[in-house]
Structures are given as structure tokens and as C-alpha cells.
Amino acid sequence: MKKALMIFAATFVAIAVAMPALAAVEFQYGGVFRTRWITSNNLNDGSSDVQDNNNMFDQRLRLYLTFKASENLKVVWKAEIGNVTWGSFKGGRMGADDVNVKTKNAYVQFNIPNTPTTAIIGIQGISLLNSWLVDDDFSAAAFVTKIDNFTITLAYIAGQNYPDSTGNETESYYSSTKDNVDDYAFAVTYDQKGMPIKGTLTGVFMNANMVPWAIYPEVMQSPVTSQAYPAGQTTTAALPGVFIGSTNYYSTAANPSTSIAGISWMGNKLDGVKNNQMFDLGFNLTYKIDWLSAYVNFAKNIGSVKTASRQVIGLKGTSTGTEAVYGSVIGGVPLIDVGQVQDLDYTGWMIDAGVNYFCGPYTFNMGGFYTSGQKTKDQRVYLYDSNGNITGSYVTQRYQSTDNVDFFTYPGTTSKYFSEIVGGGILDAAGPFASAAAGNNGSNFWRGYGFPSNLWTVTAGAAWQVLEKTKLSASYWYFQTSESVGTGRFNTDLSEKMSNDIGHEFNLYLTQGIVDGLTLDIVGAFLLTGDAYARNGYIGVTTAGTPYIVQWSKDNVYEVGARLQWDF
């Protein structure tokens, strides 16, 4: 921290010395400082059987520097120091020195002469459709045109430009686009002064080439490369980026290293990705008068991706004796059928609506949203004995359909906040079992904070402005999955218990102004968990192929904390 402050001090001195020569340049500054205390229990696993109590302090400082030549030209730099967790080895322990200054934004903004268009070029924040499409910092070029009551935005977002020289393809990796992700966006807003209605039509075209972006939501946090394996390539190894053996969004195993061949329990293996293109089209309508406001957001996934899906055609064991497990069968009998290359259509959709009523010091709100989920199917598979002979029995296995990409997905990174526990809220340092990181094998086939998918909710809340600087607010949320998800697998025949119930969440906030814009928020949240919040057991398999049952009891979740913040 001391090194960072010295850097900033030197920068300010240099600017001060240069100011006489730069008299035409106006210097502006601002920023946000926050520090938080967070404690929670059962947030990560929905159970008290394993210790997952979290108690921590963290802090973050963002500085906004603007160099303004005129109303027609300015350069903006936004830096971030943090997040720093108190007591950590990365700048939070005694001494506190660390290299933790990051660039959030760095762009030039200028008006194009003789046109009504403003250009913004560089690393910038872009939010579309109230965070339902994208909401993050991007390397991008945006052009905003204002004509009468219309505002038209066109943008190019460089999601990923990753040359790959390690693949099997012969062309020069310098010109290869197979690992590129490009987004092209537009937004047309109609807003007439004096009218209570405002509307926006938004579209984003994603061209992800051979990158599994949007198919697996966790990839959008940290895109991966195609590794040069086109759709239809056959291999038995789990290849980075290809997700042929998904142990991420579709997996329910607790430890991927103990699963055989990396086969997920309710998902099918994919043999690479090709021609991954999606178009999202959505709209927002808002209505606002003195005592009432209302809104609705809608978005639809359109497009397709070419891939190959592998089906489980055989299991090892018997339905009444030895546990049915995945694994190699003596004699070379294949348990996995290499699927044919096919086009999967993006069919997901979402809708979000709400209303707020203002009555003096009181505000009342209600609303909710729905995001589609991945449909599931039952398939009948053979059972083989240890010698590779069919036992004559079948079992029914539930798995996630790969006929289409049915769950609502996103063309770029976003950060959608809503409730405190499932939706990130103010204390977003940790997310729930199913959402903290989609790579978590307990993801249970739904997502909350960050990229809501296979999730719907209804909510109601109220706020009371007790004093000028004191506000109390509370909200209730009921969550379910749109498509049922697995809650546990214990039976020999691999049947899956299913549920939609995530739970009832209650949030309570006290907001207190302290001095000169410094604000303290005190937060309390409690979730009565349903069966779908997290799995309560599964059949594990050792590397030697020996099955074992893992089971834990379900418990409720709480989160308590505070945030001290100054916007300046």
C-alpha cells in the first residue's frame, strides 16, 4: 500500500509541475473507498457437516482521474487498489506492502466533428439491458449518437484475442482467429423529455469461433482456448478448454480427481466446439412518475454452435448387487459412444419485471425474474460385468439434454446483483454453493449471482427513511430452479432425486449517513434452504473404481456484515 501511495504522490507532483505547460487541460478526480466486514455460515455448501464459516475484513480504493481538454475531448483513467483482505499475505498482513494497483478503465472520449456522435475508445465499462446481457470492463470501441429523442449506441467488444501456437493446425498462429471472441452490440433508446415512458432495444452478436463461451457460463469469467480440437475430434483425455469431460457446470462429483474418465453425472461429454455464434435480442421498458415506477426486461438467446456430444451407453455393475459405476470394462467394451457433430441451437430466454410505490418516507416494491434452464432426459443404458459381458439388465440414468442450449446464457461477462445470499448483494465477496464459482462441483445446475441461469424468483420489500441520514429496508425472496436439478444420488441404479426448491431468503439493511457522504450499511441475510440449494449426497468412485457413498445433512444459511463507503 505504501508503494502504491508513493507512486500516486509522484504522479501528482509530476502533474503539478507540468500544469503551467498544460494550462489548457483541466484535471478532475473522484473515486470510491470501501471497507467491509463479512461473516457467513453454510454459504458454500448448504450444510453444517463441514466447517465453512467465513469471517473476514476487506477493503478497496478506486481512483478516477480525468484529463479534460474541452467539452469535445477527455482522457479517463480509473485505477483500483485492492481488493485487500485484512491479514492476508497479499498486502493485508503486517507491513501491508504489495503490488496491487490495477487499471480498471483507460479510454479517450471525443466528439466527432460535425456529427452528433461521441466516440469512446479504450478499456471502459459497458452495461447493457440492466446487466442482463453484459456489465463489466471491456477493451472496446463505442459510438454514441444522439438525435432528437433517440440515443443510438454501437459498440465492438474484444472479448478475447488469443493466438495459439501450440495446436495441431498448420496455419500461422499470428493470423488464427479460432480462439477469438468478438461481440458487436447496439442499443437504441427512446426517451422524450416530460414523458414517463422510456424504452430501449438492445442486441449483441457474439462470435466465439471455437471457444466454448456461453455453453459453459464459467468460461465467461476466464475464457479458454479451443486447443485446436475441432468438433468431432475423438480423444479419451480431458483436454483443457475442450470440456469433453465436463467437471464444471454440469458436474456433481465432489472431487473430479476421484471420478473415472472425467464423466459428469448429469452432463454429456463434448468433443470440442466450432462455429460458436449467438445473437441476443432484448428490450427494456420503464415507466416513472412521482409516486410510482415500473420496469420490464426481456432477452432471448438466438444462434447455434457446432459440437459433438458423447452418450453413456454402458455401466459397470448390476442393479441389485455391485454398485453401477463408470469405468473401463475388461475386453474393450466401449462405455462411451462418440457422438456425431451436430448444431445446438441457443434457445434460452429471460424476463424480469418489477414495480416500486413511493409514499412519503416509505417505499414498497415487488417483482421477480425468470431465466430458462437446461432440460433433462432419461436414458436407458446397459449394465456390464467385470468381464465385459452384458448382464441383461438396464438402468435409467437422468442426464442434461444436449439437443440444444436451453439455459439462458450470456454473450459476455456480467455482474447481475439482486438478493444478498443468492444474488451477491452488498457482501459479494462470497457467493452461494451454486453460484460462487461455476467450476465448483456443487454447482447443482443453476446459477445465481453473476450469471443467473435456471433460476426464477419473486420478491417483495419495503424501505423507511427514518431520518435524513437513516434508512431501514427489508426484502423477501423465494427462489426456485426453472428446471428440476439433482439433489442426491445414493441408489445402485444411479437414479437421481430431483427438486426445484432453492429456498426462502430474508434480507435486512440499515443505512446510516455519517459525515460528508461517508455511509455505513449494516446487512443481515438468512436463507431457509430447500433441497435444490445443494446436493446432500452422491456415489463417489475411487481411482481404483471402488464406489462409496458420501452424504451430509442440509442446513440453513446466514450472512451478516457491514460496509463503510465514501463516494467522492
Question: What residues fall within each predicted segment?
Answer:
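Flexible glycine-rich, low-complexity coil/linker segments exposed to the extracellular/periplasmic environment
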Residues: 227-259, 381-452
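Hard-cation-handling environments
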Residues: 365-377
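Beta-barrel outer-membrane channel/assembly domains of diderm bacteria
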Residues: 3-123, 134-135, 141-154, 168, ...
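His/Asp/Glu-rich, glycine-adjacent segments
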Residues: 157-164
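A conserved mid-domain beta-alpha-beta active-site/ligand-binding segment of alpha/beta enzyme cores
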Residues: 202-206
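A conserved hydrophobic secondary-structure block that centers on an alpha-helix together
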Residues: 127-133
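Internal, charge-rich low-complexity segments
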Residues: 167, 211-234, 238, 306-323, ...
